[in-house]
């Protein structure tokens, strides 16, 4: 078994990752808060597409950007402008090659100009509507393996000694994000969380700075992945008695 990634190692990884920000996204930190992005154009592309080259993003990701479990399409709404921008750039450049329904994304991303990717990323980060959470019971009834929420909570909050660090040490409380490096993963779609954690573990996805997510997911079992996804898919964004959500995901 690999050695546990203790706090000093995690901090070293974070420091190194901060220097590796993608040229397509995090190198544009002068655009943080998205000055220069045309949010109205991003909305148009999201809702209507771009001619015959790019269908409306909402077709798969939903009108509110909350994703669709049935298609394995992730939530994009409010998960972080720099992160979405980086993913679109990586998809366009061939640095991220999804499988399944997401396999069409590199073609669509490449059909967008860099400016249009900025526009779309900015628009989806303005989507702050009521959560449209995964229906875990419906997924279970349909034959999808669902984990144990309390076991997922333990991994997210505390990690497992000798296996994985706490998810919230990077992604913030209940996965509510820590911009600009770490996206919102709380209230993400269940099927997408399972697919991505599996891809990180199997190293079929490899566009993470310094291989951080691959290191974190390496020792996770299928049960661990299902448990984490079960908790995160319905995780509260606020602490008990506090309804204020910090601006952690711009």
Question: Residue ranges of each PLM-predicted region?
Answer:
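Bacterial N-terminal signal peptides that target proteins for export
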Residues: 1-13
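The canonical Cys-X-X-Cys-His
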Residues: 42, 54-63, 120, 164-174, ...
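Sequence context surrounding c-type heme c attachment/ligation sites in exported
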Residues: 43, 47-58, 85, 157-168, ...
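Axial heme c-ligation environment in periplasmic c-type cytochrome domains
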Residues: 69-77, 91-127, 132-140, 178-184, ...
């Amino acid at each position: 078994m690999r050695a546990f990634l203790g706090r000093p190692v995690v901090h070293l990884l974070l420091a190194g990752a901060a220097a590796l920000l993608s040229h397509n996204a995090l190198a544009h930190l002068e655009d943080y808060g998205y000055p220069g992005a045309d949010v109205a154009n991003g909305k148009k592309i999201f809702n209507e597409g771009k001619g015959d080259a790019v269908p409306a993003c909402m077709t798969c990701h939903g009108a509110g950007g909350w994703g669709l479990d049935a298609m394995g399409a992730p939530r994009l709404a409010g998960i972080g402008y720099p992160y979405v921008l980086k993913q679109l750039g990586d998809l366009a450049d061939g640095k991220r090659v999804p499988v399944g329904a997401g396999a069409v994304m590199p073609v669509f991303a490449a059909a967008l100009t860099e400016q249009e990717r900025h526009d779309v990323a900015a628009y989806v980060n303005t989507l702050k509507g009521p959560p449209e959470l995964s229906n875990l019971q419906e997924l279970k009834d349909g034959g999808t393996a669902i984990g144990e929420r309390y076991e997922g909570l333990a991994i997210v909050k505390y990690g497992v000694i000798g296996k994985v660090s706490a998810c919230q040490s990077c992604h913030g409380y209940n996965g509510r994000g820590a911009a600009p490096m770490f996206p919102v993963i709380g209230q993400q779609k269940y099927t997408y969380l399972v697919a991505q954690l599996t891809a990180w573990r199997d190293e079929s996805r490899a566009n993470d700075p310094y291989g951080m997510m691959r290191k974190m997911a390496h020792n996770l079992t299928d049960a661990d992945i299902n448990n984490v996804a079960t908790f995160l898919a319905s995780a509260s964004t606020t602490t008990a008695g506090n309804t204020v959500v910090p601006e952690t995901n711009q």
